[in-house]
Amino acid sequence: MTKANALFDLSGKTALITGSSQGIGFALAKGLAEAGAAVVINGRDKAKLADAAEKLETGGATVHRLPFDACDHGAVKAAIDDFEASVGPIDILFNNAGMQHRAPLEDFPADAFDRILNTNVKTVFNVGQAVARHMIKRGAGKIVNIASVQTSLARPGIAPYTATKGAVGNLTKGMATDWAKYGLQVNAIAPGYFETPLNAALVADPEFSAWLEKRTPAGRWGKVEELVGAAVFLSSAGSSFVNGHTLYVDGGITASL
């Protein structure tokens, strides 16, 4: 193995990815496993989680399943503490759990606002805190929060989602500010528009797809596999002095008007 390859090798590391039974989370789990990490996949649907685990194991990955509700602070702490005690340390955390709800802001349901806030922001706090407490004791750890282009930009009909992703970007900075002194690196990845279950309605909309392809300098939707390079970098020794940064993987959409 060359020095360059060793810098990004995740062999011997264990990575927890929340919301990883499908979409971006599954792609991240697959990519981290291919870089050498054992992966801990998470979700509330045990059947989907089992299916995801089978697919990853077929590809040769070492997989653990941890089906907790990331919105439940007590359940998160119990699950993380039990895993650390019975299986081993979590070296890398990807806070990926998220949801979307589209509606005009003046008609946006209050209960949907609460759900999106809990799912997109509270989960980052819940899981980040539970895992960081163990990382701090060891003096090392990598946390990567999944933000969005909506961390910086807004679109009609998704104002609460935009607010939550802005919060993720700033919570990332806050985590880095508090935890860097303990040897942790906390960063975020902000995906652009990718072909995922969360974006299924948009992918199926010819008018939106045409607008997106014109708006994005790269001229196309992103493929989830294109997030893996950023994920491996921020999980590896190659990012040892990168902290509090949000890395946009968006085909250039936030760089242009």
Task: Write out the residue ranges for each language-model feature.
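Short C-terminal tail/terminal secondary-structure segment
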Residues: 2-6, 153, 232, 243-257
